[in-house]
Amino acid sequence: NILENPGWYTSYTPYQPERSQGTLQTLWVYSSCLSQLTGFEAINASLYERSTCLAESLNVCLRLHRKGTTVLVSESIFPGDKEVVETLIRETDVLVEWVPADDKTGLTSFDEFKSKAERLSNDKLLAGIIFPQVNSLGLLENVDALTDLSTSLKVPSVAIFDPMLLATGGLKPPSRFGSEGQGVDIIVGEGQHLAIGPNYGGPGLG
């Protein structure tokens, strides 16, 4: 029974040798399935939840693009994710500039995203851009245009996706975002609803 498999309940590998191999097998199966679903070769298993994973992706962007100091993030992400990011970057050198959603459409304003990205890039401050595939209002963002923007500016791109919607909704996998199908560099998602019961909001599987 997948739902009762304790391997889904935690990302930690137990120290007991008689359990380790089964847990590692479970994590390998999970990573392999997500790899097939997203088209990405490397899938971790896992961080605490999507919000923490998103915050870590900021650090990855800064390490991949060391001259940059600022990551552009769409404000149409889930409010809880935004709160966690702002909490974890407090008292650090990580800088985030939020791009608001259009009041009429509910989508991230691409023109404003592009304007801010080009300004930061010209000042050699841009380290990466982050955007959701499906935003907090349930709307599909223009992932191809945003991916093309990061490609043209030569900075890492991070896409926040929902594996359940990707598996059942016919959405384009993040490995094929962009007008030329070049894909994003990093993906962030939440896997709790793949196999774990709600349990008052946790545990997560980022």
Segments (PLM) and residue ranges:
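Conserved PLP-enzyme active-site core in the AAT-like
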Residues: 52-206
